[in-house]
């Protein structure tokens, strides 16, 4: 050990010498004040050591660039003089490594940072100064320049100071070396200390002197040999031999034999408490249940071998006291183990000694556990209820007292309370029976008291007390039962409950509910007697006092009887309180009464309740209670009236209180009063129910008194009495005389009225029933279905009707008597007025009207009559009384109309719910008929009018169903945008009972209902008639009954003639002077304002809507649509005239061509247009058109004529195809842009194009249902981006290129379709497909090559090729091409002066022009919009066009639901709102609200319109 340590100590002087040497070097370096050596520049430039706190270095620079090394190395040679050239001395300080010095940054990098910062500030300042131009900005600019100059100067001054500091910075290098040297020495000391600690704890721990082996040394010295080796060596390297399992089994078996033998010899001395002895594996386990368990064994075979105690287990447990741990600590158990082992070693009977020792310990432990449990209960849950009277661990006695009574005595000190336990329990160990364990003794003794189970191990004082409490409670209850039965022999006392016993007492003889039973129980914790009656409050004074009396030791029979009488009265009072809760009374306290009212209560018994009537607050019901031997509790009721400062009792009649004979009142819920001579059955009704009946009777009597007074004030005679025995309801207020309130003679009505009374029903709600009984009713139900209304066996022609009860309930809560009287009078007036008109009608009904109508119901306040051919129309008549005075002008009849199922379908098993919808057209004039009935009171005339006019009105009423007509195209043509471009197609309204007006645009038809089943129709359009051929329309239907009346009725003038609308168009407005002869006027299309007389059948046929080729229409509808279409077509053609088209200087070259209007009449329009034959704008050949109203079919047709020799393809078949296409597609479509596209198509004549167009139209019209390819011409284009409509077929201004759009699909109803778009070169006769699809281009090339070779026109060839490939699957609907029209909306025109465009305000005459791109310009035909079904309005229509937005009549309701004249939808919804030149034309609601645009010539320099002068449009 010394040899290893000495070298370490030997090196210490050298380290001390080195340390002293370094200290001298430090002192020499610090004393050296010579300047540093000159700085040698580094390759990367000058470097400077910067401190982080200098404020010049930037942290961002450190994070982005690596730190550089020192500018120059520390010169190790000291220079004594700058001019000396001698060899310098060596520096004693060590060199600082590169990474151990402070961080540095190159000076050039620092300068670059400063320059970049200044440049950035200058740039930002220059940008900000440009925005400051005012005077304030000039001042801010100057201040910004000053701040910038000051900041820049300060920054560069810091750099100058830094550069100057570099000259002397070399002196700081010495400090860096000193710092590094000190850190190095400190690390040496730390390493030395760590090494010494490691050696001390590791290597030197076993460096001690060994023990000297004397015996081997003697052997070696004496014998010269080494004979003995230490046993530690053997134990360390040679393990002991293990015993085998067989040997283990033999050993344990032998031990078991030895233990059995020894125990058998000791068996006579083994205590009997040891219940179990188990011998196994050489061990004997002895168990004393509930106390302990020990394990013993023998460690030898000799008789002298002592028993060895291996383990002791204490079985006494209490988890609450031990908090989950054993009660005996392991250290205590080890001590017990040692003491018991020593006692067993010296004992003659070790087994008995072990039992005696451990048994004594366990008994003491059990008693201590019980004491701890009792202490917890006394301090916790059973505080003040149990007490520990004695506890002696030596004597092993524990005495616990329970049911403690606390009392004060004069002998005690003030504040002290004496606690006396009524019962005690003693837990002890019997000295004479040491083996018996703990025993229990109760004071006083009783059977079946609680015991301790010592064998359980877990003793519980709580269980012992609980078992004891149950027995003690039963004892006390049995004693109380004997006391109660002795005090009240008739009182029935029952013992109930098993785990919680109690006594049940029936205080009243009729008590059957458990809530009214008194329950007497004993509190098991404190032993107090508890009394409870559920129906009474838990804090009831008498109940608590009775319980205290039973608990006290001084409880006499008289005291018990007194409390029982009080409780019976309290129970009856509570019964009464509960019985009147649902009645209109409330209980009041005596303190709430006035002083003079309290004086009246002086003689009344103290047990009483006071009930105040809610509806009659001046009346109080006083109910007093007093004990009685016979009735148990006697009640007395008095009525107290408090009026002003006076209070008095009112004597109640006997029939109100005791004379009510109740029978089956409870079971049936109604009161049936038996005759007065029969005996009363009050025993069937309990006492509180009789009180409720009495309160209700008194309340009824008071209410009737008030009502009778109010009725007598009105002059109505009344009588309050009961009805006969067979009439339920009790008291009733009978009305005997109403002559003073009836404004007319009503003797017949009162002869039919048997009884009129008012009853009060307060069972569930406080309601009044106005009851009237009639006989000889004028009208009864006589419909052919339903229940019969005459008795069997009576003749059908019997004049007297059955007696009928009519009872109507008025659910009026808290109503005042004045309101009830008013309602009674109103009800009588309603019956009287209804009876007046019904009685008069009943006389005519039996003679005449029963063949034309049926009575559905007559209930004296309402009459329901069904009429019509099918009896499916209902007339509902009622009378409403609104005024206070009977017979006032404010009263009126309610006349409503409805519908029902036809009578023939009531008994039918099959009902067609999909028939044409029915609505009652008389609802249009219900107000007019109501006013007439109010003036005349003549129901006979009203029913005559309804029966006579129902057939024609049902037909005419078809026009009142809501059907919208699109005005989007027309509004775009006129100019101003309309947000809701729809209008009602028709508007039907009634002027009076016999006059109707039907409006459709500018056309107004007046329909007169005449007698003799005749109808008169005339044209009453404003200013002049406009219906050409109106007589011819009805004459075509029935020429025999149709005639023109000679008397011409003047047309009413407009309310505002200046702005009401145009008169009628003249040829000068829309056409130039032409050298053409006008056609002769057809006399059948004459215009007249004379009424046209016809029969009902004629007007029904004219208005009968039917499904014709997919369109639901009728002759009159088709005629009016034609008249309206002619007016709209004239506007469309005027927009196609040269005057309304942009001039040639405009950049737009998409149009529908020019047309010239030749002649315009109400029944036709003639115009012409140049042919598109390849000559362009220089073409001289014309196409002549005539759109006219056919006098035979009374629908629109068109005639097309080409000049002779100009179109070889204009054959009769092709012309018929063109005209048929107009009739089936263009006209039903109703779209103005479709007409423009149609005209553009029919003008194309180059290279027999007419034949191709006719083929296309034929394919569309004659599409077979089985075909898999459906081809349709698209006439209208819907731009989804601009939401505008436009013609789908357009031509450029030079008339050289025309656009075609053809829709190809599998069927007309197919959801997927494709659009074939191509441009036809009119002059070159070839087609171009501007598409990115190579297949389409290839098809166009093939068609052009074929056309060039064989001649003909490529339009039909291309379409036919597409159809063939579509059928073969090469061209399918999924391959949708891109749209080729980017903007096809027409140019917008000037907004009218009074209507501004949406979201803009433009001056009158201003023009907003939209310039669509050229056809050949890139992007002008290819738009980004995707093609969908909304872009092509012609798709999936029966013949390619929509049905004018018309709806199925089955989907609409009654007229007027959208808005008639006067509604707020002026130019959107009102009929006639779209007229020439204005969205709100003639027929709109406010004619002066919408003006018309002024078409004035443009000023110089403007080129928006044609230079021709236009007159004001339209003319006023």
UniProtKB/Swiss-Prot annotation:
InterPro entries tied to this protein: Med14_N, Med14_RM2, Mediator_Med14, RM3_Med14
Region forming the signal peptide: none
Region annotated Disordered, chain positions: 22-98, 1434-1516
Pfam assignment, any one: RM3_Med14
Keyword Transcription: yes
Domain of life: Eukaryota
UniProt feature, compositional bias: Low complexity: 34-47, 1463-1473, 1502-1516
Compositionally biased residues, Gly residues: 1474-1483
Comp. bias regions, Basic and acidic residues: 72-83
Gene Ontology CC annotation, any one: core mediator complex
Subunit structure: Component of the Mediator complex.
Family, as annotated: Belongs to the Mediator complex subunit 14 family.
Protein name: Mediator of RNA polymerase II transcription subunit 14
Gene from which this protein is expressed: rgr-1
């Amino acid at each position: 050990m010394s040899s290893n340590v000495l070298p370490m100590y030997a090196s210490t002087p050298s380290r001390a010498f080195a340390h002293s040497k370094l200290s001298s070097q430090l002192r020499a370096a610090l004393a050296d004040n010579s300047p540093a050596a000159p700085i040698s520049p580094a390759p990367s430039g000058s470097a400077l050591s910067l401190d982080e706190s200098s404020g010049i270095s930037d942290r961002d620079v450190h994070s982005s660039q690596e730190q550089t090394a020192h500018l120059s190395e520390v010169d190790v040679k000291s220079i004594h003089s700058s001019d000396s050239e001698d060899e310098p001395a060596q520096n004693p300080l060590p060199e600082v490594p590169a990474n151990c010095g402070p961080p540095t940054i190159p000076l050039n990098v620092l300068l670059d940072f400063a320059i970049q910062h200044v440049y950035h500030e200058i740039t930002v300042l220059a940008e900000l100064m440009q925005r400051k131009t005012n005077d304030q900005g000039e001042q801010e600019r100057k201040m910004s320049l000053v701040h910038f100059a000051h900041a820049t100067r300060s920054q560069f001054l810091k750099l100058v100071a830094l550069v100057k500091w570099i000259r002397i910075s070399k002196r700081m290098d010495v400090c860096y070396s000193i710092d590094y040297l000190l850190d190095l020495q400190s690390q040496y000391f730390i390493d030395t200390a760590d090494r010494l600690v490691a050696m001390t704890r590791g290597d030197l721990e076993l460096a001690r002197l060994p023990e000297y082996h004397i015996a081997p040394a003697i052997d070696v010295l004496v014998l010269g040999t080494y004979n003995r080796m230490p046993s530690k060596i053997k134990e360390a390297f040679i393990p002991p031999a293990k015993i085998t399992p067989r040997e283990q089994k033999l050993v344990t078996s032998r031990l078991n034999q030895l233990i059995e033998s020894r125990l058998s010899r000791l068996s006579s001395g083994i205590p009997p408490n040891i219940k179990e002895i188990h011998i196994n594996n050489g061990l004997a386990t002895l168990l004393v249940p509930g106390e302990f368990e020990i394990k013993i064994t023998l460690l030898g075979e000799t008789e002298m071998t002592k028993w060895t105690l291996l383990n002791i287990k204490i079985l006494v447990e209490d988890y609450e006291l031990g908090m989950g741990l054993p009660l005996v600590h392991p250290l205590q158990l080890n001590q017990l183990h040692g003491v018991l082992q020593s006692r067993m070693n010296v004992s003659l009977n070790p087994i008995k000694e072990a039992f005696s020792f451990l048994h004594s310990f366990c008994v003491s432990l059990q008693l201590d556990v019980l004491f701890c449990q009792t202490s917890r209960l006394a301090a916790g849950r059973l505080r003040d209820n149990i007490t520990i009277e004695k506890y002696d661990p030596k004597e092993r006695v524990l005495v616990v007292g329970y049911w403690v009574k606390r009392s004060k005595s004069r002998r005690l000190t003030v504040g002290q309370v004496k606690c006396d336990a009524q019962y005690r329990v003693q837990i002890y160990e019997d000295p004479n029976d040491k083996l018996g364990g703990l025993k229990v003794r109760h004071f006083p003794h009783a059977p079946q008291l609680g015991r301790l189970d010592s064998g359980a191990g877990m003793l519980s004082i709580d269980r012992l007390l609980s078992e004891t409490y149950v027995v003690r409670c039963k004892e006390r209850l049995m004693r109380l039962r004997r006391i109660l039965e002795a005090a009240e022999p008739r009182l029935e006392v029952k013992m109930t409950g098993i785990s919680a016993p109690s006594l049940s007492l029936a205080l009243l003889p009729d008590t059957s509910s458990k809530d009214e039973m008194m329950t007497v129980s004993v509190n098991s914790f404190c032993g107090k007697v508890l009394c409870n009656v559920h129906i009474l409050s838990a804090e009831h004074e008498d109940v608590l006092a009775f319980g205290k009396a039973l608990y006290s030791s001084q409880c006499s029979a008289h005291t018990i009887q007194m409390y029982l009488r009080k409780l019976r009265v309290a129970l009856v009072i509570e019964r009464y309180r509960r019985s009147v809760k649902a009645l209109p009374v409330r209980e009041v306290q005596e303190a709430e009464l006035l002083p003079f009212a309290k004086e009246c209560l002086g003689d009344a018994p103290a047990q009483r309740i006071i009930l105040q009537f809610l509806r009659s607050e001046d009346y109080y019901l006083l109910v007093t209670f007093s004990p009685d031997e016979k009735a148990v509790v006697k009640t007395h009721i008095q009525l107290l009236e408090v009026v002003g400062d006076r209070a008095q009792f009112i004597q109640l009649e006997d029939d109100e209180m005791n004379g009510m004979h109740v029978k089956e009142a409870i079971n049936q819920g109604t009161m049936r009063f038996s005759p007065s001579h029969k005996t009363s059955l009050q025993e069937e009704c309990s006492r509180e129910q009789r009180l409720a009946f009495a309160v209700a009777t008194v309340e009824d009597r008071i209410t009737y008194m008030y009502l009778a007074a109010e009725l007598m004030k009105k002059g109505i005679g009344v009588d309050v009495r009961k009805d006969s025995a067979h009439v339920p309801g009790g008291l009733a207020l009978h009305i005997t005389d109403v002559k003073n309130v009836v404004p007319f003679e009503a003797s017949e009505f009162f002869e039919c009225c048997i009884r009129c009374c008012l009853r009060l029903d307060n069972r569930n709600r406080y309601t009044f029933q106005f009851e009237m009984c009639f006989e000889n009713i004028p009208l009864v139900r006589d419909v052919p279905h339903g229940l019969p209304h005459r008795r069997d066996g009576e003749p059908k022609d019997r004049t007297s009707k059955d007696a009928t009860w009519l009872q109507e309930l008025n659910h009026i809560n808290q109503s005042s008597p004045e309101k009830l009287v008013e309602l009674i009078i109103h009800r009588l007036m309603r019956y009287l007025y209804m009876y007046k008109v019904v009685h008069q009608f009943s006389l005519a009904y039996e003679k005449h009207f029963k063949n034309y109508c049926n009575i559905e119901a007559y209930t004296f306040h309402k009459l329901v009559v069904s009429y019509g051919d099918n009896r499916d129309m209902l007339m509902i008549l009622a009378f409403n009384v609104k005024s206070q005075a009977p017979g006032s002008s404010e009263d009126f009849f309610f006349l409503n109309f409805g519908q029902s199922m036809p009578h023939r379908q009531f008994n039918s098993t099959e009902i067609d719910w999909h028939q044409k919808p029915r609505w009652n057209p008389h609802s249009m004039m219900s107000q007019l008929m109501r006013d007439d009935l109010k003036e005349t009171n003549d129901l006979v005339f009203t029913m005559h009018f309804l029966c006579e006019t129902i057939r024609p009105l049902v037909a005419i009423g078809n026009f009142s169903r809501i059907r919208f007509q699109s005005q989007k195209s027309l509004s775009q043509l006129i100019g101003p945008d309309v947000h809701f471009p729809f209008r009602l197609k028709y508007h039907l309204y009634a002027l009076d009972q016999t006059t109707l007006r039907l409006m459709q645009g500018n056309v107004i038809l007046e329909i007169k209902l005449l007698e003799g089943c005749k109808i008169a129709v005339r044209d009453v359009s404003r200013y002049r008639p406009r219906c050409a051929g109106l007589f011819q329309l009805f004459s075509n239907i029935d020429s025999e009954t149709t005639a023109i009346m000679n008397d011409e009725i003047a047309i009413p003038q407009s309310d505002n003639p200046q702005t009401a609308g145009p008169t009628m168009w003249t040829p000068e407005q829309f056409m130039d002077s032409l050298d053409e002869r006008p056609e002769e006027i057809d006399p059948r299309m004459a215009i007249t304002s004379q009424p046209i007389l016809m029969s009902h059948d004629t007007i029904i046929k004219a208005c009968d809507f039917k499904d014709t080729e997919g369109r639901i229409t009728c002759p009159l509808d088709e005629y009016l649509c034609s008249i309206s279409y002619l007016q709209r077509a004239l506007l469309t053609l005027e927009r196609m005239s040269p005057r309304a088209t942009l001039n040639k200087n405009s950049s737009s070259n998409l149009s529908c061509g020019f047309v010239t209007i030749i002649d315009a009449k109400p029944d036709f329009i003639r115009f012409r247009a140049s042919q598109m034959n390849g000559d362009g704008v220089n073409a001289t050949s014309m196409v002549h058109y005539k759109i006219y109203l056919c006098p035979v079919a009374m629908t629109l047709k068109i005639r097309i004529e080409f000049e002779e020799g100009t179109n070889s393809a204009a054959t009769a078949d092709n012309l018929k195809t063109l005209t048929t296409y107009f009739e089936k597609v263009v006209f039903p479509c109703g779209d103005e842009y479709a007409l423009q596209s149609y005209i553009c198509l029919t003008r194309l004549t180059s290279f027999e194009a007419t034949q191709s167009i006719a083929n296309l139209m034929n394919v569309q019209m004659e599409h077979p249902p089985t075909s898999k390819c459906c081809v349709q011409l698209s006439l209208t284009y819907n731009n989804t981006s601009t939401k505008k409509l436009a013609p789908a077929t357009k031509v450029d201004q030079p008339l050289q290129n025309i656009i075609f759009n053809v829709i190809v699909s599998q069927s007309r109803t197919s959801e997927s379709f494709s659009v074939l778009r191509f441009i036809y070169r009119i002059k070159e006769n070839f087609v171009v497909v501007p598409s990115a699809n190579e297949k389409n281009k290839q098809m166009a090339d093939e068609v052009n090559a074929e056309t060039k070779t064989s001649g003909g026109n490529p339009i039909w060839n291309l379409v036919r090729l597409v159809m063939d490939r579509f059928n073969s699957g090469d061209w399918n609907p999924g391959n949708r091409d891109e749209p080729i029209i980017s903007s096809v909306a027409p140019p917008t025109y000037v907004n009218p002066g009074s209507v501004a465009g949406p979201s803009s305000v433009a001056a009158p005459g201003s023009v907003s022009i939209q310039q669509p791109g050229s056809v050949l310009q890139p992007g002008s035909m290819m738009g980004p919009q995707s093609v969908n079904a909304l872009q092509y309005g012609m798709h999936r229509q029966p013949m390619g066009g929509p049905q004018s937005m018309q709806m199925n009549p089955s989907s609409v309701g009654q007229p007027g639901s959208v808005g008639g004249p006067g509604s707020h939808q002026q130019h959107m919804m009102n009929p006639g709102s779209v007229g020439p030149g204005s969205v709100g034309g003639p027929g709109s609601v406010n004619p002066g609200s919408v003006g018309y645009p002024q078409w004035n010539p443009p000023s110089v320099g403007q080129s928006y319109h044609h230079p021709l002068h236009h007159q004001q449009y339209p003319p006023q």
